[in-house]
């Protein structure tokens, strides 16, 4: 297993993605995050395990196509992002939910 600098791991994960599909996946211990596009699966796994103190079973990544945006006659693109769906070991879902969704 390659070693990663823990100071750099926190910068890999940008934010959790909370959509209808992501909420349905949470019932299966799968959590969705937006990560930087150059992050690899082992780096994402190490970052999630370090940030949330959970055991990651599997990491799936998705790089959706960039969307076109038009401003007047100029055509541009939205910034590209990478989506990571992280499967957490059974029993660890309470740890990650307390951090992502604290009780008010």
UniProtKB/Swiss-Prot annotation:
Name under which the protein is recorded: Large ribosomal subunit protein uL23
Alphabetical list of Pfam families matching this protein: Ribosomal_L23 (PF00276)
SUPFAM superfamilies registered for this protein in UniProt: Ribosomal proteins S24e, L23 and L15e
GO cellular component: ribonucleoprotein complex; ribosome
Subunit text: Part of the 50S ribosomal subunit. Contacts protein L29, and trigger factor when it is bound to the ribosome.
InterPro entries for this protein: Nucleotide-bd_a/b_plait_sf, Ribosomal_uL23-like, Ribosomal_uL23/eL15/eS24_sf
Entry's family note: Belongs to the universal ribosomal protein uL23 family.
Task of the protein: One of the early assembly proteins it binds 23S rRNA. One of the proteins that surrounds the polypeptide exit tunnel on the outside of the ribosome. Forms the main docking site for trigger factor binding to the ribosome.
Any one Gene Ontology BP term: translation
A single GO molecular function term of this UniProt record: structural constituent of ribosome
Organism encoding this protein: Nostoc punctiforme (strain ATCC 29133 / PCC 73102)
